[in-house]
Amino acid sequence: MKLKNTPLSVAVLTALSSFAYANTADSVKLDVVQVVSENAGAKSKTNVVTLKDLQKSTNEDLRGVLSAEPAINFGGGNGGTSQWVTIRGMGQDQIDFKVDNTSSDTPVFHHQSRFMLDPSLIKRIDVRKGAGSASAGIGVTSGSIEATTVDAKDLLEEGQEFGFKLNAGVSSNKGHSQGATVYGKAGVVDALLSGNWQTLENYKGGKGYSNKDGSDVVKNSALGQRGLLAKFGVDITENQRVVLSHRQEQYHGERALREEFDFSQSYLAGTSKDLKAGQKLSNVFAGKDRRGNDTYYILDANGALIANDATNNPRYRITTQDTTNLEWSGKNMGFITEAKANAYRIETSRKEPAENSTTRVLTHGANLDLDSEIGESHWLKYGVNYRHQEAKPNSIQEIARDRATGRMVATGVKRNQQKEDVGLYVEGIWGFGPVTLTTGARYDHFKFKANSGKTVSHADFNPSIGLIWQALDNLSFNTNLNYASRSPRMFEAMLAGNTLRDVSDNLRAEKARNTEVGFNYDVTKNISLNGSYFWQKVKDAHATKANTIVNAALLRNQGYELGGAYKQGGFKFRVGVAESKPETFTFNNASLDHAVFAVATGRTWTTSVSYKFENPSLELGWKGRFVEGETGTPSRGSNAGSAAIKQSGYGVSDFYANWEANKNLMLNFAVNNAFNKNYKSHSQRAGGNSLAGAGRDFRMNATYTF
């Protein structure tokens, strides 16, 4: 695609600094998004998933909708609150998840996923990889997944004032879903109400999976889910719009305490102190426990080994996330070409009725993002970001029982944790013929209040620079160097009421540097290629020592992504490959949980082949995901000690058919994991007790719109 020296072409530089956000009502911005997505290598991709994609698929979680991205991997069995995600091997505590420019980075519990999203409520998903540029927002050191929810204008056809959508689906392994959406407009006002409900039973693993009870069913994997969205918009003028929305995601079911583990795959082990009535120790050594003691397999009264699933303490749990967001957008306001502002509140809660326990994380924030066109070939982006978070455990316990000694001791906990982040940024986009340059600067400041009562604060300056060279009409090269910082993440809210987590006197933000080179090449009108190679370093990474957060870790990562596509008429073929080599280092006897920082994942290949018939309107296709074997370091509870272990490679094939029966009815069919592969994702804790992927799954869903 040729880039001309126009206001459109200069915006390609957002590919180096951040990806663009499209307003489909504005053809200029839509053109910019197309240019950006065609000239960003693999670092930033817009419209990775669109409303149209979601309507013609059976996918009901992020794992499914982002399956074409080889650099993004999901662990955690059938998902929900066990759905762990990595981007280029960087774990969930190093990446961000945003919906409608709202976000929270505080974990409720380290054995639970931080990401909650129902794809049925989404219009589009964009992906950012590596450290973000100045305009990327707070704490984008290793990438982000950014979603935009649907509104009435996205669903109403021209001339339509009211609409209704019904959807229902069924899965053989094992679940069903149903949902409804109503939307309409009257004058300058539009509104949407949407709800989706999903019921998942305990799923079956692939061929050959069996737990120690002799079953092919993964225990404690059943889950009920619901997603609700209410959205109201007002077009104040032709150039200004206000939208108020409230979104809720909720998961409930009897889940394991450590949701990313399936302990029924191993036998119960312990010391003599762990024995219950009728039990005895065998003479078979089972390894060291967390305190370094020798453990042996435990036998029941009949001398038989005992499946270990009770250790995971399954119980009924409700996890809910409520987000309220007020957004304003405007354009053509003198020097300010475009503007967007929002203020939001997020409440994430984890309730365990049997324990009468409720843990909450409260977040409120605001963003102001301004764009100004300067002359014919330049663009200026500037703004401010603010976020405040508070972790509220079920209670503050100044005295509690020590898990190691069993004695009542002072915890040192005095208050709830709080954190405040403020960021200011400016970013220039400068077009000079075939070359487009971007320069940016970001100032970030945090104030952290630990549960010990201690407060620390620190500020960072983060520059960014990038370049796109349109070498030929169909060939462009890009490079960028981005710095970003991340403030200390608050200690998991569920344990913060009786577990001290202090902060060192001179605690600083983590500092990430990401260098990347890439290309985009349209070989012909039918064949396209893209690729990137990156180097990343995160210094002053946060670790713990003596229950204190310290700057005593280093993260390094490097790797590449390559992608290619061919299309001819109704035929499409895509292939992609990604490989990364993240490493973590700790100093001064500090420790960290590797699985939430960086995860060793094997080289990943994604492929897809499809053909779209015009009459009938039918698409048939195949998608494959193939992960090569990799050596990873297991985490606590993996029953594999601390030595590196080999994670097996695997390949999973999905077949699908999408039939648009008429303009109102869409029918989707799929066979996921068609060959019933028994596999374990690499994007979770390594070891024998990590969750197995779901086995063969026949799916069908229908969407009716009128």
What does each model-identified segment do?
Residues 153, 159-164, 181-313, 629:
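Periplasmic-side early beta-strands and strand-to-turn transitions of outer-membrane beta-barrels
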Residues 376, 431-437, 525-539, 544, ...:
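Gram-negative outer-membrane beta-barrel transporters
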